[in-house]
UniProtKB/Swiss-Prot annotation:
Induction: By ER stress (at protein level). Displays a slow increase with a lag phase of 6 hours but exhibits a dramatic increase after incubation with ER stress agents for more than 12 hours with maximum induction at 24 hours. Also induced by accumulation of misfolded proteins in the ER. The gene is SELENOK. Pfam families: SelK_SelG. The record marks 81-82 as: Cleavage. Cleaved by CAPN2/m-calpain in resting macrophages but not in activated macrophages. Macrophage activation up-regulates expression of the calpain inhibitor CAST/calpastatin, resulting in inhibition of CAPN2 activity. Truncated SELENOK proteins produced by failed UGA/Sec decoding are ubiquitinated by the CRL2(KLHDC2) complex, which recognizes the diglycine (Gly-Gly) at the C-terminus of truncated SELENOK proteins. It comes from Homo sapiens (Human). This is Selenoprotein K. Belongs to the selenoprotein K family.
């Protein structure tokens, strides 16, 4: 790719693909990715805590408190009664 530096037109093919600036830029890119990844994990935790109200208003600051709701069960819903399933294939009731 052609670019201008100090009033001169230069071609990037003349530079080595493994120059030091490329390696350092790659390192800092990975470092910033790791930092932002962990920041997003921590910020979601802070948002959850804020949704329950101010910590000064809470009676349960030390982690104790009433238990939460039990986890929802996944699978079939057995408490609703619907029509019974059709009989197995077979005769006509003779």
């Amino acid at each position: 790719m052609v670019y201008i530096s100090n009033g001169q037109v230069l071609d990037s093919r003349s530079q080595s693909p493994w120059r030091l600036s490329l390696i350092t830029d790659f390192f800092w890119g990975i470092a910033e990715f790791v930092v932002l990844f962990f920041k997003t994990l921590l910020q979601q935790d802070v948002k959850k805590r804020r949704s329950y109200g101010n910590s000064s208003d809470s009676r349960y600051d030390d982690g104790r408190g009433p238990p939460g709701n039990p986890p929802r069960r996944m699978g079939r819903i057995n408490h609703l009664r619907g029509p019974s399933p059709p009989p197995m294939a077979g005769g006509u009731g003779r």
